[in-house]
């Protein structure tokens, strides 16, 4: 029994949970779950005329009990179960969806389908922070602004994320099933911890991380006015909680690979500037190209003697820009030029002629591309 002054923990005292599956009669549905899907009987009663059975299997508990029809439907018609399988085609003779005698639908799905990458659907996308795009509340109470509406057909997601007030972040250890994911700290600071990367990191404005596939991590706390930019591929990917690994792990393994990629922490205070891919501009290289074997490149670009880029096209999968500071005008073929300010974003599809003109001396652009090397045409 807990001490009187000990706070009550939600769920304290609960031993297990089961799903109630209404069925009448019992036997056909019992046979379905035990003989076809491999559940085992844990309890059945009364012995002389069984009406209730408790089953377990595959991490799930079921309680089969009498339930009458509703509006002429079978008692379990509104219940749907999903069984995650190594190979769904080998479980029930190739069937991927089954219907139990009580009407319950059972879906057989892949336990680990991997990253599903939608086909490319490139399109020009421009967003303006001044237009007052809606901020929604996402995971762990953070506020999200979608900077790639339409998501390029589901291939890419871009989020401008903010946490207005300082303090602990109600996050938990988790990981993402992705092809590519990066976070750039635009304003404020945030403390995060990553699997096998030593003690928690303090990310400040200008810093950036590559989160390789399935690396366990957790956001710990943030300062006032935190803003980060997060880009991921594909757009629809699973974020899974990690219940076994605690962070930090006590290990520092900077060369460890996660899904073929290495973790990157870019400290802006130690960055070196070099020529960008267009003349008259320079950039600080984040280091993501080397860590992803050329899959993606991330840089911060700024003027270095020029105030515009030449009109050009590219043949890359993805070219994204987020205005970090200053102003410019985005010119795109067949579109009215648009003034771009801090927080504004663009995605330019392949083979569309474009240029950035009238760049202010303090102009800075977060430049994200897939692949790292952008073929200009």
PLM region descriptions:
Residues 2-30, 78-81, 109-136, 141, ...:
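N-terminal beta-strand motif that seeds the catalytic metal site of vicinal oxygen chelate
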Residues 11-13, 20-62, 134-142, 146-165, ...:
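Core segments of cupin and vicinal oxygen chelate
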Residues 15-25, 53-60, 67-104, 178-186, ...:
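Vicinal oxygen chelate
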Residues 16, 48-50, 152-156, 167-182, ...:
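A short beta-loop-beta micro-motif enriched in histidine and acidic residues
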Residues 40-77, 105-110, 149-151, 155-165, ...:
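Conserved short beta-strand elements that form part of the metal-binding/catalytic scaffold
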Residues 44-45, 72-74, 170-177, 194, ...:
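Short histidine-centered beta-strand/loop micro-motifs
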Residues 147, 196-214, 333-353:
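Short acidic-glycine-tyrosine-enriched beta hairpin
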Residues 161-164, 175-192, 231-234, 300-304, ...:
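Short, conserved beta-strand element in jelly-roll/cupin
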């Amino acid at each position: 029994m807990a001490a009187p002054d000990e706070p009550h923990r939600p769920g304290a005292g609960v031993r297990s949970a089961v799903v109630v599956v209404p069925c009448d009669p019992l036997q056909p549905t019992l046979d379905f779950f035990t003989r076809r899907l491999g559940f085992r009987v844990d309890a059945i009663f009364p012995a002389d005329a069984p009406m209730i059975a408790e089953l377990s299997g595959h991490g799930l508990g079921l309680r089969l009990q009498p339930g009458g029809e509703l509006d002429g439907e079978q008692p379990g018609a509104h219940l749907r179960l999903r069984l995650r399988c190594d190979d769904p085609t080998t479980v029930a003779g190739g069937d991927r969806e089954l219907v139990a005698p009580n009407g319950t639908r059972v879906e057989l799905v892949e336990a680990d389908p991997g990253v599903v990458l939608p086909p490319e659907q490139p399109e020009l996308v421009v967003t303006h922070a001044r237009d007052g795009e809606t901020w929604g509340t996402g995971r762990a109470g953070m506020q999200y602004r979608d900077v790639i509406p339409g998501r390029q057909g589901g291939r890419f997601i871009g989020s401008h994320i903010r946490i207005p007030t300082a303090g602990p972040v109600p996050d938990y250890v988790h990981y993402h099933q992705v092809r590519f994911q990066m976070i750039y700290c635009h304003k404020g600071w945030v403390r995060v911890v990553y699997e096998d990367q030593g003690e928690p990191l303090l990310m400040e404005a200008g810093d950036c991380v590559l989160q390789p596939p399935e690396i366990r991590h957790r956001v710990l706390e943030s300062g006032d006015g935190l803003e980060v930019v997060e880009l991921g591929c594909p757009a629809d990917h699973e974020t899974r909680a990690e219940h076994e690994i605690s962070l930090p792990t006590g290990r520092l393994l900077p060369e460890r690979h996660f899904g073929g990629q290495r973790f990157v922490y870019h400290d802006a205070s130690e960055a070196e500037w070099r020529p960008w891919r267009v003349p008259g501009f320079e950039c600080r290289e984040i280091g993501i190209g080397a860590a992803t074997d050329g899959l993606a490149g991330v840089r911060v670009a700024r003027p270095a003697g020029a105030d515009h880029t030449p009109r050009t096209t590219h043949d890359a999968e993805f070219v994204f820009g987020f205005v970090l500071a200053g102003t410019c005008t985005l010119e795109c073929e067949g579109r009215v030029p648009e003034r771009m300010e801090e927080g504004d974003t663009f995605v330019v599809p392949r083979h569309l002629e474009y240029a950035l003109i009238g760049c202010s001396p303090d102009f800075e652009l977060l430049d994200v591309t897939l692949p790292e090397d952008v073929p200009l045409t």
